């Protein structure tokens, strides 16, 4: 009895039995009688492990870690991330290793994991704790603490080597900070080490503070000395500068007095000019104010006149509108009456014009239809004549082609003799008969001159022999030629 088994996305099939030497791994397969199929999950599992180890000085410590471990599947390379693919033999070896890892997992762990889920956890914990303890026992606590990163990497490498024997692969490893073992009383190495570091930091801070305070006091004393030196120097320079400034002050005082007198004179002149300009400006302003007053009075008078004119205009406009309304109502009624009469007359004329136009349109359409029919008949007749001429031309063309073929065949039969071909065509065409007919019609009614000559005697003729008779006939023909030629020359107008 066969059945088809399919594994899930994260599952594999381990098939053993008939026809299989060892173990066959597949994602889907037919399972026949005599075979056994085991479906195992290849999903990685996270393990939180708290390893208790001891250094070479016999100091216990704890190493908390979190590992994500699972069976090693076939790894497909990504050219973008992993770079160019390795050679074919190397790639084959890698794939073989992955296949071997899955086979190891299927043989050693998969079945026991299904029966006892904690079996893999205990196995992994045992491997990690064993490798960590072996590595820690060969190092001092100081080496472990100072090289924590290196120690973690070595633990990871050693654990991975051990797990390779079981077909397991570490997907990720997060090793936490080293801590003291709480189960070992009196073991406070990392706490003491922290206190030591804290004390060292505090000592360095105090030394730095003392150095800063010392530098501050020295700087303050240096500042005080520099201040006294600078004060004495400034006093001496001040006395020299004071004497110099007194002499300069006297000179400047005399110069200032002269400048003050000049300035006062200039100011008096400026004041006089300003007063004169002020008087002129006051006179101009008085004039402008008086002119403005006069203009204001005149403007009031003009505005009163304009307002009075506007009032009179409004009154006249009101009277005009009143008269216009009275007269306009009568004119509007009369206008509307006349408009209605005109519209009625216009409507009658439009109806008559529409009727006339309709008759003309219908008459034009009838004439157009007659003209179209006549044109259609003419077109049909022309088409018939054109078709007859086309058929006649086609017949003539066919006759011409037939004649050409006949002439070509006759010329071929006559051996290329064009003279014989011409005579044959003239005979077939009745050219000679036509020439004889034309000559006969031309000679009808003509009275030719005929002369008959004979050489035969009465008695002697009967007694002549047959040969003599023939000679006499030939002589008669020769005697007749001159008159015949003369007659023909007179008829044909040809010189002979």
Swiss-Prot record:
Belongs to the band 7/mec-2 family. Flotillin subfamily. May be palmitoylated. InterPro entries: Band_7, Band_7/SPFH_dom_sf, Flotillin_fam. This is Flotillin-like protein 3. It comes from Oryza sativa subsp. japonica (Rice). Keywords: Cell membrane, Coiled coil, Lipoprotein, Membrane, Palmitate. It comes from the Eukaryota. It is a lipid-anchor. May act as a scaffolding protein within caveolar membranes, functionally participating in formation of caveolae or caveolae-like vesicles. Residues 301-328 form a coiled coil. A lipid is attached at residue 37 (S-palmitoyl cysteine). It is found in: Cell membrane; Membrane, Caveola. GO terms for cellular component: caveola; plasma membrane; plasma membrane raft.
């Amino acid at each position: 009895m066969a059945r088809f088994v399919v594994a899930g996305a994260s599952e594999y099939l381990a098939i053993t039995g008939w026809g299989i030497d060892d173990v066959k791994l597949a994602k889907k397969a037919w399972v026949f009688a005599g075979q056994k199929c085991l479906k195992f999950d290849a999903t990685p599992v996270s393990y939180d492990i708290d390893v208790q180890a001891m250094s070479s000085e016999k100091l216990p410590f704890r190493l908390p870690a979190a590992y994500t471990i699972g069976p090693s599947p076939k790894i497909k390379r990504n050219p973008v991330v992993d770079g160019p693919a390795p050679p074919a033999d190397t790639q084959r070896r890698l794939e073989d290793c992955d296949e071997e890892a899955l086979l190891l997992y299927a043989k050693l762990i998969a079945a026991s994991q299904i029966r006892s889920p904690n079996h893999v956890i205990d196995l992994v914990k045992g491997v990690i704790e064993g490798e960590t303890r072996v590595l820690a026992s060969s190092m001092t606590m100081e080496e472990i603490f100072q090289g924590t990163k290196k120690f973690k990497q070595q633990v990871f490498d050693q654990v991975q080597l051990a797990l390779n024997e079981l077909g397991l692969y570490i997907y990720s490893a997060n090793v936490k900070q080293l801590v003291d073992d709480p189960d070992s009383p009196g073991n406070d190495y990392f706490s003491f080490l922290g206190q030591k570091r804290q004390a060292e930091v505090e000592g360095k801070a105090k030394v730095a503070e003392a150095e800063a305070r010392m530098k501050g006091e020295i700087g303050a004393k240096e500042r005080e000395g520099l201040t006294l030196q600078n004060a004495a120097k400034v006093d001496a320079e001040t006395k020299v500068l004071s004497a110099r400034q007194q002499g300069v002050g006297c000179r400047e005082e005399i110069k200032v007095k002269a400048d003050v007198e000049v300035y006062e004179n200039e100011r008096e002149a400026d004041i006089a000019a300003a007063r004169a300009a002020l008087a002129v400006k006051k006179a101009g302003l008085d004039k402008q104010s008086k002119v403005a007053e006069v203009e204001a009075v005149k403007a009031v008078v003009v505005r009163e006149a304009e307002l009075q004119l506007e009032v009179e205009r409004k009154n006249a406009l009101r009277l005009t509108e009143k008269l216009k309304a009275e007269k306009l109502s009568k004119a509007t009624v009369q206008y509307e009456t006349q408009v209605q009469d005109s519209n009625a007359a216009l409507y009658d004329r439009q109806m008559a014009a529409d009727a006339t136009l309709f008759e003309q349109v219908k008459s034009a359409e009838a004439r157009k239809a007659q003209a179209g029919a006549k044109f259609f008949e003419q077109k049909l007749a022309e088409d018939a004549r054109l078709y007859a001429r086309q058929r006649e031309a086609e017949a003539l063309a066919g006759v011409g082609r037939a004649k050409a073929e006949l002439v070509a065949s006759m010329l071929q039969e006559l051996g290329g003799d064009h003279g014989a071909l011409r005579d044959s065509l003239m005979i077939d065409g009745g050219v000679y008969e036509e020439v004889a007919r034309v000559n006969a019609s031309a000679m009808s009614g003509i009275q030719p001159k005929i002369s008959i000559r004979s050489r035969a005697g009465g008695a002697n003729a009967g007694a002549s022999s047959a040969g003599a008779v023939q000679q006499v006939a030939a002589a008669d023909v020769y005697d007749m030629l001159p008159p015949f030629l003369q007659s023909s020359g007179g008829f044909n107008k040809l010189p002979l």
